[in-house]
Amino acid sequence: MAAFRPPQFKKSKILAENRRARYEYAFEDFYEAGLALTGTEVKSLRFGQGSIAESYAEVKNGEVTLINANIPEFSHGNRFNHEPKRPRKLLLHEREIRKMQTAVSREGMTVIPVSLYFNNKGKAKLELAIARGKKTHDKRATIKERDWKRDQARLLRDKG
């Protein structure tokens, strides 16, 4: 069985990645969303700060909100600086929001941010995935598969 490959969005500079999510969740569908940010948040992201490791997205009242994402205050900001962990509105088409709403209403499904990046036009984008939490035995299978691939590469390298 071939591995599931997510669609490739045009990413010019990846700012933050949720690498743990690939281990904890099985992804089903991917979306690209814009973020409604303030000026100091954009400046802070351009300096390479920001984390989406413990964040998730919530679909409520026809809107998608990014919860618990950390974008630190801009170092040269003044009294207009932003709150680091405030909820941020995600910009998606209505059709995509409805699809997310129906997917999340099923048991065990959630919306997880996978990566935060600037696209080629300089806009901050967030790659979202509709995901199902993995069970412990699924995580073990992932570890075994990764170890086997590493061993294969080592064997091929040593023989050649």
Swiss-Prot record:
Alphabetical GO CC annotations of the entry are: cytosol
The protein's predominant localisation is cytoplasm
Name of the protein in question: SsrA-binding protein
What is the purpose of this protein? Required for rescue of stalled ribosomes mediated by trans-translation. Binds to transfer-messenger RNA (tmRNA), required for stable association of tmRNA with ribosomes. tmRNA and SmpB together mimic tRNA shape, replacing the anticodon stem-loop with SmpB. tmRNA is encoded by the ssrA gene; the 2 termini fold to resemble tRNA(Ala) and it encodes a 'tag peptide', a short internal open reading frame. During trans-translation Ala-aminoacylated tmRNA acts like a tRNA, entering the A-site of stalled ribosomes, displacing the stalled mRNA.
State the PROSITE patterns in the record: SSRP (PS01317)
The organism's lineage is: Bacteria, Pseudomonadati, Pseudomonadota, Alphaproteobacteria, Sphingomonadales
- Per the similarity annotation, which family is this? Belongs to the SmpB family.
Q: Which Pfam families does this chain map to?
A: SmpB
Q: Does the keyword Cytoplasm apply?
A: yes
| Keyword annotations from UniProtKB, A to Z | Cytoplasm, RNA-binding
Keyword hit for Thylakoid: no
Q: Which GO terms describe its biological process?
A: trans-translation
Q: List the NCBIfam families hit by this protein, alphabetically.
A: PRK05422.1, smpB
**Signal sequence bounds:** none
Question: Which molecular-function annotations from GO does this UniProt entry contain?
Answer: RNA binding
Organism name: Zymomonas mobilis subsp. mobilis (strain ATCC 31821 / ZM4 / CP4)
Q: Where in the cell is it found?
A: Cytoplasm
